[in-house]
Amino acid sequence: MPEAGPFGWYSDWWNHGAGGPPAWETFHLRELRRLLERDYGAGHRRVVAGLSMGGFGALSYAARNRGMFRAAASYSGVVHPLHDGFPEGIMAGLVEFGEDPLALWGDPVAQRRIWEAHDPYYLVGRLRHTPVFLSVGDGRAGPFDPPGVFDELEAELSLQNHLVAARMERVGVQLTTDFYGPGTHTWPYWERELHRSLPMLLRGLRG
């Protein structure tokens, strides 16, 4: 996934109903896509993959724009931002980056419809015809970590990914998972999972 700012969430921000910038989804899928096609020879067979917040973006973009991507992969992705307690973390992060915590998708209760419209957990039905790869660790120290560490974020994302995977299986999404147990929210795992998902992504590009 291309960059979406330090905390942009691959979304066109609500901004209390006013819209306007930042508009990451529009930028990536309209402006940047057209530039790549026009000036760099990018084709119309596309796949999308991302890690952490980018994993959210990969699934959200694929679900919200059906037919644009032939496969989607998420590595330790935030795949259910409405999961218990997580909206508060997102809003706290927005404040930490100097943003209005309600500008992204609004209040998770009052504007729940907007949150659900971006949350892959609620969009799995729109991925029925898109092969999906999900991978995540469980937060315990794995082969790339010093002994004894525990990663609370990765443990939370493990819960989210298991919930989304179960929902995908119920609606018939063509799903591949690598829930590899011990592992933290760090680059060595994501690099390994990119290699593991590459055959699926390449099949999507080849059609």
Question: What name fits each language-model region?
Answer:
Residues 1-207:
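Non-catalytic cap/lid and distal C-terminal segments of serine-dependent acyl enzymes
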